[in-house]
Amino acid sequence: TRFALVSWARRCVSETAIKLEHEISMLDENEKKDYLDLMNMDEPVLNKIIFEGYKMLGLKTFFTAGPNEIRAWTIKNGFTAPNAAGVIHSDFERGFIKAEVIDFDDYIKNGGELGSKENGKLRLEGKEYLVKDGDVIHFKFNV
């Protein structure tokens, strides 16, 4: 039947797209860029799906960074700095003092926290600060 044919075609297209996305994910950055350019794409479809999903669900990502690890945390739109701190640990929210915040692009451009601080890109935010997508945050707290 026509429905069965359409259903089969959708499955095949989906399976092919999934395989292509997997292959793209296995490429090094230069090969990935060349492949995406060849396909006239600016980024993998999976990135777009994740981004749109976050928008639809009202979610944002902020980062914490230490000497050996950078970690992404998911929060809801409208979270204040103490709310975001609470995602890491309830003590962080309860004892929140302030947040040291760097915009993600500034963090990358300045080579991390130290360079951002030296170039005046680190700012102190209080309890009312609404966390922005991509903020790199170091929470100060006391419990």
Explain the meaning of each model-derived region.
Residues 1-12:
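Single conserved hydrophobic/aromatic residue that forms the stacking wall/gate
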Residues 14-132, 137, 142:
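C-terminal-of-GTPase-core extension/linker across diverse P-loop GTPases
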